[in-house]
UniProtKB/Swiss-Prot annotation:
Encoding gene per record: rpsZ
HAMAP family: Ribosomal_uS14_2_B
SUPFAM superfamilies: Glucocorticoid receptor-like (DNA-binding domain) (SSF57716)
InterPro entries linked to this entry: Ribosomal_uS14, Ribosomal_uS14_bact, Ribosomal_uS14_CS, Ribosomal_uS14_sf
Protein keywords: Metal-binding, Ribonucleoprotein, Ribosomal protein, RNA-binding, rRNA-binding, Zinc
Family per similarity comment: Belongs to the universal ribosomal protein uS14 family. Zinc-binding uS14 subfamily.
Protein's name in the database: Small ribosomal subunit protein uS14
Positions that bind Zn(2+): 24, 27, 40, 43
Role description: Binds 16S rRNA, required for the assembly of 30S particles and may also be responsible for determining the conformation of the 16S rRNA at the A site.
Listed NCBIfam families: PRK08061.1
Length: 61
């Protein structure tokens, strides 16, 4: 889990647009966040396996 202080810091409007970054909506993780779903890879995988993300299914080839 991300620190509450870091999540609060990120939510504030930044002075420069470049300083803004994405965070996972579910756990607050700052790395490997998918913009389309606003989830990190770990949360995305958990929810996809449970079938809670519409239109996402496990690939097999």
């Amino acid at each position: 889990m991300a620190k509450k202080s870091m999540i609060a810091k990120q939510k504030r409007t930044q002075k420069y647009k470049v300083r803004e970054y994405t965070r996972c909506e579910r756990c607050g993780r700052p790395h490997s966040v998918m913009r389309k779903f606003k989830l990190c890879r770990i949360c995305f995988r958990e929810l996809a396996y449970k079938g809670q993300i519409p239109g996402v299914k496990k690939a097999s080839w």
